[in-house]
Each structure stands twice: as C-alpha cells, then as structure tokens.
C-alpha cells in the first residue's frame, strides 16, 4: 500500500469512528510523531463534519516525561486550540519504584489513569497512534477494539515509521525537538 492509500484508509476509519462514536471521540495524544499524525487527520475529519468543533485530546503525564515533550504538548495545544485534558496517575512518585517492574509501572502510571480518565470524561472512543510495526504483539490487532465501556481505534495501524515521517515532512507538521537528537520514541525518562 502506498502512503496515499494508507492515509485514505486512515481517514475512512476515522469517518467510521465519527459515525459510530460522535465528535466526543478524543485522540490519545502523547506529543509523539505517531499520535500527532492521528491528531491532524482527526482534526480534518472533524472539521469537515462539524466545522468549528473543538478537537479533544487526552494526554497522559506520568510525571516522568521529558520536559521537551511537555513543552511541545503545551505549545501545540495552545497554538492549535485543542481541548486538551492532561491525565496524571494517583501515585506518589517519590515513593514509587519507577521502572523496577516495567509492566507494573506502565499499569500504574499509564493504563489505570488513562482508563479512569476515559470513564470519568465519558469518552465513547479513543483514537491512538498505535502502529503494527512497533511491536509483534500489535501486528495482529484489529484497528478497532472494545475496551469495555469505550472503544480504541488505531487508524494508522498499517503505517510504518517512514510513512509517519514522510507525512510530517510533506504536511510540514511540527515535532518534538528530541527527535532531532536521535530519539525514535518519546516514552518516560526512566525507560529510555
């Protein structure tokens, strides 16, 4: 599939998500390259169907994010007028054993707070920047999944990292300065 075909597929998926879940759907926006592509595409789909509607974005701040990511997030949210909700875990980071057990750490700092926020905000669906080529476990996933109480959509599932960067350059999208320093992914500092 060409990038143009992948983009068209992603837009069709987002239109389907909009039809099924409505404009209350939010983008799970990390400030990373992948979810920024999803954010921009969703913005276009939403603007076409609901001119003037605010783009909802949910950002997870674990308390361990790089300062550059937080600066980028806040700057772009202001510049683009996003309806940004920042979610934080209910964990005392001074006492928490960061990255001692990566699975527990991700559960406590990411999964639990994200699911709680989605429920509290009553979000019917969350669009993510998940790509199949990032992890073998993701390769067999469907683009739309039920998470019990809400759905998660991965509209750019078939995109490669090269596709994402090509789209960024062609569309002149901004990106976090850490990518210019050689980072390929912008997770929590202890795990990098």
PLM regions and their residue ranges:
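Nucleotide-activated chemistry modules centered on ATP-dependent adenylation/adenylyltransferase
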Residues: 1-192
């Amino acid at each position: 599939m060409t990038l143009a075909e992948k983009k068209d597929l992603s837009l069709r998926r987002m239109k389907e998500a909009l039809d099924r879940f409505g404009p209350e759907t939010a983008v799970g926006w990390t400030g990373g390259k992948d979810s920024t592509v999803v954010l921009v595409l969703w913005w276009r789909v939403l603007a076409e169907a609901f001119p003037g509607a605010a783009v909802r974005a949910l950002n997870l701040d674990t308390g361990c994010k790089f300062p550059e990511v937080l600066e980028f997030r806040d700057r772009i949210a202001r510049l683009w007028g996003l309806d940004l909700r920042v979610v934080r875990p209910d964990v005392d980071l001074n006492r928490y054993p960061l990255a001692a057990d990566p699975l527990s750490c991700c559960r406590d700092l990411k999964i639990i707070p994200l699911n709680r926020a989605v429920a509290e905000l009553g979000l019917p669906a969350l669009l993510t920047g998940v790509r199949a080529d990032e992890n073998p476990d993701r390769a067999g996933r469907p683009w739309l999944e039920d998470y019990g109480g809400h759905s998660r959509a991965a509209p750019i599932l078939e995109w490669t990292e090269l596709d994402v960067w090509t789209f960024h350059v062609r569309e002149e999208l901004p990106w976090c300065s850490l990518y210019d320093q050689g980072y390929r992914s912008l997770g929590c500092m202890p795990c990098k």
